[in-house]
Regions:
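A donor-sugar binding/catalytic signature common to diverse glycosyltransferases
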Residues: 22, 277-325
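Leloir-type glycosyltransferase catalytic cores
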Residues: 324-368
Length: 368
């Protein structure tokens, strides 16, 4: 029988962003903590190996090695998938004996009600151990997605207060208002502490990340997922005109990681589309740049993670998308503008003329 081990906390991470946030919070809180990685991102084994070297967490567990749970989730037939997951629920102690056997935690940090969060909480309840559920920042979803903001009622007591660590409590409160059932706490800026920066540099090998030298960045999108063919053509032509106006050599294109098209052949394409934008914010002088995007919420990151204020130009009002906006885009970007010290640096043109007028004005400022 395994000896019981009690620790302050454990973190569940599914994305590189969550991993960076977990490192930031673990160092800030100074707790004795473990981390469990649900490896759904590229090169996860490399990141996990480097994470162990940082010493931030006492124990780093790759949940991908819990092959039964991973295989069940990956079954394509939804009925068979549901059956396989149900069988794991029925044998939850056996399913997680290897990863969790003997371990108890005062707190379980998660960014959302994820698959492995649900399974781990089922395990803890089965062995009569109920950790306090604490949410930590997952980017845009933590501010406007209920799945990332509201804990599953099965795992919190009826009258409990949900603790949430966020990079921008100000933005959260502007988006959602105050709630006496929530305890919103600030998560320090990602590079506030040398230990955090050193750990992130090691995990992601930031010295090898190409620096963006161009003054303008375009965060491109997967056109076929959000536009019809005609709109996609109009969108591309607009961006080509932007590049022509600014000068091709002054523009860096960051393609979507899944975009294999040759749309930008002959332009300055960022050499590794899989590099998280958050890391570019850390390694490049992003506050001195102009960033253009259709509606990528990645543009929130310079401000909320690092306190930097690049010029942001959002184009979503110029093009009709397949999924109609329910007002959510306007809400989050207008509130992002409200937390900028210089609100004129968040631009949302409603016409082509307005877009190119913005670019003319920015060109005049740079020429001074």
């Amino acid at each position: 029988m395994k000896k019981r081990v009690e620790k302050d906390a454990a973190y569940i991470c599914t994305t590189p962003f969550q991993l960076m946030s977990a490192v930031t919070l673990a160092v800030s809180n100074g707790e004795t903590a473990d981390v469990f990685i649900d490896p759904q991102f590229r090169e996860n084994e490399k990141y996990i190996k480097r994470l162990r070297k940082t010493g931030v967490f006492e124990r780093v567990t790759d949940l991908g090695r819990d092959t039964g749970a991973v295989r069940a989730r990956n079954v394509k037939n939804k009925y068979l998938r549901g059956l396989r997951i149900k069988l794991i629920h029925l044998n939850i102690k056996g399913a997680f004996r290897k990863s969790l056997g003997g371990h108890r935690y005062k707190k379980l940090y998660t960014s959302n009600n994820s698959y492995f969060f649900d399974l781990m909480m089922r395990y803890f309840l089965a062995v009569d151990a109920r950790p306090q559920v604490v949410f930590f920042d997952d980017g845009e979803g933590s501010y406007d997605n209920p799945k990332c903001r509201i804990p599953n009622k099965k795992y919190v007591s009826k009258d409990s207060v949900t603790v949430k660590y966020l990079y921008s409590p100000e933005l959260y409160l502007k988006m959602n208002g105050r709630n006496n059932r929530e305890d919103i706490r600030p998560l320090p800026l990602m590079d506030h502490d040398k230990r955090v920066r050193k750990a992130i540099d090691l995990i992601f090998d930031t010295k090898k990340i190409p620096v963006v030298g161009e003054p303008l960045m375009i965060l491109d999108t997967m056109r076929e997922t959000c536009m019809d063919e005609k709109t996609a053509k109009d969108y591309s032509e607009t961006l080509f005109k932007v590049c022509e106006k600014i000068g091709k050599n002054n523009v860096c294109i960051k393609q979507h990681p899944r975009d294999k098209s040759d749309t930008w052949k002959g332009y300055n394409i960022y050499p590794d589309s899989s590099v998280p934008f958050e890391l570019l914010c850390m390694t490049s002088d992003v506050d001195k740049k102009v960033i253009i995007t259709l509606s990528s919420t990645a543009v929130m990151m310079p401000k909320i993670l690092f306190g930097k204020e690049p010029v942001i130009i959002l184009l979503y009002k110029l093009f009709k998308m397949k999924i109609a906006d329910d007002g959510g885009r306007d809400k989050i970007y207008k509130q992002l503008r409200n937390i900028y010290q210089n609100k004129k640096r968040v631009l949302i043109p409603e016409t082509q003329e307005e877009l190119f007028s913005y670019l003319d004005e920015l060109g005049k400022r740079r020429g001074r």
